[in-house]
Structure formats: structure tokens, C-alpha cells
Swiss-Prot record:
The lineage of its organism: Eukaryota, Fungi, Dikarya, Ascomycota, Saccharomycotina. Glutathione binds at residues 33, 40, 123, 243, 350, 425. Disruption phenotype: Impairs glutathione reductase activity. GO terms for molecular function: flavin adenine dinucleotide binding; glutathione-disulfide reductase (NADPH) activity; NADP binding. It is found in: Cytoplasm; Nucleus; Mitochondrion; Peroxisome. Homodimer. This is Glutathione reductase. The active site is a redox-active disulfide bond. FAD binds at residues 33-34, 53, 60-61, 69, 139, 334, 342, 472. It comes from Saccharomyces cerevisiae (strain ATCC 204508 / S288c). The gene is GLR1. InterPro entries: FAD/NAD-bd_sf, FAD/NAD-binding_dom, FAD/NAD-linked_Rdtase_dimer_sf, Glutathione_Rdtase_euk/bac, GSHR/TRXR-like, Pyr_nuc-diS_OxRdtase, Pyr_nucl-diS_OxRdtase_dimer, Pyr_OxRdtase_I_AS. Disulfide bonds join 61-66.
Length: 483
């Protein structure tokens, strides 16, 4: 039997639910990068478009992902660069070594958050410019195939559409089987931290954990990284795995290899955490624990009411054209989980709208998920496009591939006592040595990879690389001069 409170709440919902169903050409559930891009592109073709967002426009990337993460990376990178100034003959009357580093976390957080808020406003204005209707609230399919949205004022509206896109993104996974797991936070929680932790434990060997550990260490926190294997970034080529792992250890990040956390305890007197690991060791007096052990699809939009199929990982199944198994319902981005990168969601969203609402030439438009470049904003940066050396051997056979390697110290570090590694690898296949994989570690890897990504997407061979005149002196010239 319902309590009086629940009965009153249900009555309130019934009283405030709209009896009119509003119809659109296109309804987008999720105001992240992919959803916004698709909505704007559809509206640009004249489609009457509605976008529903539960939290803030921009999704994970703008609010708790790529954008504020990169801002923090800049701060951490600058802290390291400043410590190099004395060796370059600059400010020698000032103590700029790492031991004297100070960082005003609260002030910087305020500036960073203000920047994110400005971006939210820009997203809003861009949607308004394209005449996209925006509703803030929680969307859910009902059994009629329409979408009910519980708005922030607790009123509920019902919408129908010719085409519906689910682009609800993903969310962090917590290890709920570990006692005390709730004493830690996730990458979202990282951006809510009001003070810089003096001692922090980051759990996970993926790119999110590696990036956050690098930021904390660069800004002066005692940083511990707990990983299950011997290396970080195990989904990347071994040259990236080994180079970043070794450099993090060399730089002073406490990397706990072959380790798992079995229990987390809190000292109520000191407010500090004690992290127990499987090897009977522990990390004591920890200020913050950050779980970065993976992400999962953000569901809860009533997909079961319309019969949307999920895979074994509870991700929405979508084909190469972003179609789900339900006619006129589509899905893309992290909720699908093919390639969980913001530019991928944006590109897929735009191509979907091209196909649905654009001119005849776009009737078969779809995103090519092959050779998508990706980078890790570690310290130093790393980037990859194509397949790893191991994958190339499995695909083409060892006798049919050729691998070019180079490891060197960039010129910037010639004046410095502390060095940072640069490591490049080109993986080629077949008699014409088509470049099927490019893996780089070193300063400015993200900027370098963008241009080479175009070449590889176009089917470049090693000879094409060789025929490009080098720009000297740069690190990137090594990629067109390797033998």
C-alpha cells in the first residue's frame, strides 16, 4: 500500500501531466556533443527538432570530461614548464623548482567552472540560432512509443516524433563489491573537489586514470596509481604502454602494479582513508580516492518499453547507420559504446541527420569507424591511429608487416637535466607498406597526430611519408625520415 506521501506525489504527477502530445520531426534524448550536433544539423535542414537534456548542455565532454580535464592538464603541464625556466636562464632569482610549487586549486576551479558555464551558454545560443526547441528534464519512452519528459518544475509533457535519437552517454562504474567503495569518487567527482588533496589514490589503468594521475602529480599532490597489470593503457600499442608506465614511475608517481583494492576504511578522527590492497599492503592517510575503472551506458530512458535491444554489456545495439532494432529509433555515442570519443559522437550525429533530413546525396551517409585517431593527455602526451603491432601481426601475419621504430629525446630537453621521452612507431602492411598503425609518445603528440591522421585515413604508404619534406627542427620530422 502506498504511503500518504507517495499517494500525494502520484496525484501531483497526474494533475500536472499534459494531456496534449506535441509532435516533432526529430526528437533527441541527450544534450551531449553527439545529440547537440545531430539536433542542430537536422534543424538546419528545416526539421522541427526537440532536444531533451537532464542536466547541462554539452554532456560529459563539456561539463566533466574533455574540456575541464584539458584545462587542468594545461595547469599541470605549465607547472612542469615553469620548473624548467631556471635551466633556460630565466628568472634565476626566483625559486621555480618543483619543491617550491604552489597551486591555488579553489581559485582555479572557480575560473574553470566559469569557463564551462560559458560553454553551456554557447551551446544554448547555438541551438536557439538553429531554432531547436530545448527542454530540460528526464526523458522516458512510454509503452505507446512516445516520450514522456518530467521537467524540472515536476510537470510532465508527452512528445511524439517521426524520428527519435537516443544519445544519453555513459557514466562511471563503481566497484560495489569492495567494502567502503562509496568513500571514493569518480572522474565526475574530481571536478567537484574544492581543495587539492595532498595525497590521492587513482584506481585504473585506462586513459582517464592516467590523465588524472598525471594532473595530480604535476600539481604537487602525492599520487598513487593502482593498476591490475604490469602496464597502463593496455588497449594501446605496447610502445605507448611501456613508455608511459616507465616515465610515470621515473617521475615519482607511485604505481602499484598487479594490485587490487580489497577494502577502504575511513578514520573518523582524521577524516583520512586507508586503502587495503590484495598483497596485504595498504596506503594510509589518503585524502581522496578516485575510481576510474571503466564506464557503462547511461540507460533508464525506458528502452524496455519500446523493445530496444541491448548487448551483453547493456549497451544499445546500433548498426552502421545508427539504427536500433526499433524502426525510426536511433542511437550513437557512449550509450552505444563503439568508439567512446566526443568527435566520433559529433560526426555520427551529423551524418545521421544528413541521411534523415538532408539532400539525396546524403541518403547513405554514415560514419566510418575505422582509423579513428585518439590521444591521451598524459605527461607526456600519447596518440594512436589504426591498429597496434600485435593486432597487425594477427591480421596480416608477421611476415607481411614491417615496423619502424624511433626513440629519442626532443630538442627542448637538451637544456634540461630532467628528460621526457619521445617514442614513435609506424606499422606497415603489404608489399606497398601501407601505414596501418601509427603510435606516438612525446610533447605535442595530439597536435602532431591530427595531420597524420588525415594521411592515414587517405591510405598513405611509408613511401608517401618518405616523400614529404621534413620540417626542421621538430620532433614530428622523425615520422617522415624513419628508416
Amino acid at each position: 500500500m502506498l504511503s500518504a506521501t507517495k499517494q500525494t506525489f502520484r496525484s501531483l504527477q497526474i494533475r500536472t501531466m499534459s494531456t496534449n502530445t506535441k509532435h516533432y520531426d526529430y526528437l533527441v534524448i541527450g544534450g551531449g556533443s553527439g545529440g547537440v550536433a545531430s539536433a542542430r544539423r537536422a534543424a538546419s535542414y528545416g526539421a522541427k527538432t526537440l532536444l531533451v537534456e537532464a542536466k547541462a548542455l554539452g554532456g560529459t565532454c563539456v561539463n566533466v570530461g574533455c574540456v575541464p580535464k584539458k584545462v587542468m592538464w594545461y595547469a599541470s603541464d605549465l607547472a612542469t614548464r615553469v620548473s624548467h625556466a631556471n635551466e633556460y636562464g630565466l628568472y634565476q632569482n626566483l625559486p621555480l623548482d618543483k619543491e617550491h610549487l604552489t597551486f591555488n586549486w579553489p581559485e582555479f576551479k572557480q575560473k574553470r567552472d566559469a569557463y564551462v558555464h560559458r560553454l553551456n551558454g554557447i551551446y544554448q545560443k547555438n541551438l536557439e540560432k538553429e531554432k531547436v526547441d530545448v527542454v530540460f528534464g528526464w526523458a522516458r519512452f512510454n509503452k505507446d512509443g512516445n516520450v514522456e519528459v518530467q521537467k524540472r518544475d515536476n510537470t510532465t509533457e508527452v512528445y511524439s516524433a517521426n524520428h527519435i535519437l537516443v544519445a544519453t552517454g555513459g557514466k562511471a562504474i563503481f566497484p560495489e563489491n569492495i567494502p567502503g567503495f562509496e568513500l571514493g569518487t569518480d572522474s565526475d567527482g574530481f571536478f567537484r573537489l574544492e581543495e587539492q588533496p595532498k595525497k590521492v589514490v587513482v584506481v585504473g589503468a585506462g586513459y582517464i586514470g592516467i590523465e588524472l594521475a598525471g594532473v595530480f602529480h604535476g600539481l604537487g599532490s602525492e599520487t598513487h596509481l593502482v593498476i591490475r597489470g604490469e602496464t597502463v593503457l593496455r588497449k594501446f600499442d605496447e610502445c605507448i604502454q611501456n613508455t608511459i608506465t616507465d616515465h610515470y614511475v621515473k617521475e615519482g608517481i607511485n604505481v602499484h602494479k598487479l594490485s587490487k583494492i580489497v577494502k577502504v576504511e575511513k578514520n573518523v578522527e582524521t577524516d583520512k582513508l586507508k586503502i587495503h590492497m590484495n598483497d596485504s599492503k595498504s596506503i594510509d592517510d589518503v585524502d581522496e580516492l578516485i575510481w576510474t575503472i571503466g564506464r557503462k551506458s547511461h540507460l533508464g530512458m525506458g528502452s524496455e518499453n519500446v523493445g530496444i535491444k541491448l548487448n551483453s554489456h547493456d549497451q544499445i545495439i546500433a548498426d552502421e547507420y545508427q539504427n536500433t532494432n526499433v524502426p525510426n529509433i536511433y542511437s550513437l555515442g557512449d550509450v552505444v559504446g563503439k568508439v567512446e570519443l566526443t568527435p566520433v559522437a559529433i560526426a555520427a550525429g551529423r551524418k545521421l541527420s544528413n541521411r534523415l533530413f538532408g539532400p539525396e546525396k546524403f541518403r547513405n551517409d554514415k560514419l566510418d569507424y575505422e582509423n579513428v585517431p585518439s590521444v591521451i593527455f598524459s605527461h607526456p602526451e600519447a596518440g594512436s591511429i589504426g591498429i597496434s603491432e600485435k593486432e597487425a601481426i594477427e591480421k596480416y601475419g608477421k611476415e607481411n608487416i614491417k615496423v619502424y621504430n624511433s626513440k629519442f629525446t626532443a630538442m627542448y630537453y637538451a637544456m634540461l637535466s630532467e628528460k621526457s621521452p619521445t617514442r614513435y612507431k609506424i606499422v606497415c602492411a603489404g608489399p606497398n607498406e601501407k601505414v596501418v598503425g601509427l603510435h606516438i609518445v612525446g610533447d605535442s603528440s595530439a597536435e602532431i597526430l591530427q595531420g597524420f591522421g588525415v594521411a592515414i585515413k587517405m591510405g598513405a604508404t611509408k613511401a608517401d611519408f618518405d616523400n614529404c619534406v621534413a620540417i626542421h627542427p621538430t620532433s614530428a620530422e622523425e615520422l617522415v625520415t624513419m628508416r
